[in-house]
């Protein structure tokens, strides 16, 4: 079978996007999804997204990890599929889509996409680390000099421990750059190991949101905008905290079409 595809990236987190409004893509064939995502035998991507029709919003987003399995919310993927919907002429400069965790609003401004995320009402603290759900599950650990950490090795100790091994968890290591005066504007730097990809990715949208909220929790911030540096580029997260609940959470950053083409799936 042959399909048209579009390759997008949001701060280095890359995705294959397919217009599946005619429901022709065989979603039950996880092997095909895995093949498309393979960087040697397919197109190569962190995940695959299908854009489909829905009566609840402008469109529906269906997201698969690189391992071929349908997964939870992907923030950078949400920003990229919003840009794709505009390319298809389905929306103009704003709209909504239905994802696995509910309805998301988005705003498109030139190359940037702002995406509203779900509210977060609980952050668990385990010693000095944080566990929370921002559409996907995340483990956040503040460390020093994270570029010296073997991310894959260290993250797998957490991702595959007896607590998280069954469902999996994304693991984020975070460094406060303002703490050692490398940055004057309070930026923080993060690296992420993603379940389903089972490797470090250049960026993670739901992870960026998780890190921003943990930074806010750690520093008693009730509202504001946190600038975050990832290996793939800059993202920002704005939020308001009402009591113990984080609301009005917006993830912002670039989303770009890299190339498009057709692929034959055997």
Named regions from a protein language model:
Residues 1-110, 140-266:
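A glycine-rich beta-to-alpha transition motif near the start of alpha/beta enzyme domains, typified by
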Residues 5-7, 128-132:
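Short, flexible, solvent-exposed loop/turn segments with mixed acidic/basic and small polar residues
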Residues 100-124, 132:
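Extended Lys/Arg-rich, glycine-bearing segments that form polyanion-binding/interaction patches
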Residues 115-128, 149, 153-158:
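Active-site glycine-rich loop that binds ribose-phosphate moieties when present
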